[in-house]
Amino acid sequence: MKPDAVLGSKVTMITKEEAQKLGYIIPDNYKETSVPKLNFDRIDKILQTAYDNCLGLRGHTLLWHSQTPAWFFGIDYDADEDAVDEDTMDARIDFYVSTVMDHVMQKEKEIAGETGKIVYAWDVVNEYLHRGRAWSLNWTSVYGDMKGTPSYVKRAFERAYEMLEKYDATDKVTLFYNDYDTYFEVEDLLALVNFINEGEKAKICSGIGMQSHVDIKRPTIEEYGAALEKFMAAGYEVQITELDFTINFDTDGTDKKDPSYDYKNEGETIEEQAAFVKDFMEMVIAKQKNRDKTVSPKGITGLTIWGLYDSISWRGKSQPLLFGTSIDDPKPAFQAFLEASRTK
C-alpha cells in the first residue's frame, strides 16, 4: 500500500464528479477541478488473499517521502511544474488519506463483514525524522523544513483517525508512526508523536513502529531494550515492524557505495547470529512481561520479520533472515527464535 502503488508512476486524472461516483472522498477544502485516479486493484487482491488465508495486514504506508511520485506535488499534478502551495497540498493529503482508508475499510466490510478483521494497523507516516534525504525534497518544497512540528504529518493522522471513527474502529485498529534507528533517536521520536497527539480529543497516534534492521553488533541488546522501555513508559503501543539480523555488515558506514548494501567480511558466523537472535528475543519477551500495564496496557503487540529467506533479502549478502537459500533451509537463527519464543 505504498503511495506509488496506488498513485502510479504516471498521472491519470479524472474529474471530481467522476471521482465521487467511484466513492472517492473529496474534502470541502479541495479546490482543484480534478483528482488523480487511484488504482486499488492490487490492494483489493491482497485484502482478499489475506482474508482467505487468515492473515492480518498492516497498511504500510500512507505518507512516505521516498515513494510518493513527484507529480503529486506539482501544479496541475505535473512534475515539471512548480510545487503547489500549502493549502492545496493540505487538501491533497486530506483527499488521499481519506479516500485510501475509506476504500480499504469498505472493502474489508465486503470481504470480512466488518472493519478491523484484516487490517489491524496503519503506518500513517513513515520516516519523517529522516526527511533530509534527497528524495524528501518534494515535501520540503511545499512546507519547508518544519523540523519537530510538521503540520502535514499531524494532519495525516487527523484524517486517518476520522476514518477509524467513521467505521467505529478506533478500538480495533491502531495508527502508527513508523521509522528506523528509533533505538538511537528515542527522544526525537517521542517529541514527534507527542506533537501529533497534542490538543487532540484522543491519542490519534497511539503506536510506534520500530523498523529494526539490526546487526549483531549494533545496536546492542541493552540499547534496544532501553528504547522499548521508554516507548512503553510513555504509554505507546509498540510494534517491531521490519526485523532482520545482519552479520558481516559494515556498521561504521565506510563502504556506503557497495551495491550489496554495505557487506563487509568480518568473519561473523550464522552461529553467532543465532546466539544474538536468542538473546534479542528473550529481551523483547521480558520487556513485554515486565512492563507497567497501567501505563502501557498493550505493550509490544507485533513483530514482523522483514523477508522470508536470505537469497531474496534486500541485504542478502549479510544473511539477515531466519532461512537461507529457501524456506526449506532453516538456519540456526530460526531454531534460536523458536526456543526464545517458548520462554515463559
Residue ranges and their predicted role:
Residues M1-F176, Y180-T182, I247-G253:
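Substrate-binding cleft and catalytic face of glycoside hydrolase catalytic domains
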Residues T12-I26, I111-E114, D123, E127-M146, ...:
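Aromatic-rich peripheral "rim/lid" segments of glycoside hydrolase catalytic domains that contact
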Residues E32-S34, H213-D215, G267-E268:
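Short, contiguous strand/loop micro-motifs
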Residues F40-D41, Y51, G144-Y177, Y183-S260, ...:
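Glycoside hydrolase catalytic-domain groove-lining segments
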Residues K45, F95, K117-I118, K203, ...:
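Generic structural microfeature
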Residues G59-T61, S212-H213, W306:
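His-enriched metal-coordination microenvironments in redox/metal-binding proteins
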Residues A70-D90, Y183-G199, G316-S326:
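Short, electropositive alpha-helical surface patch
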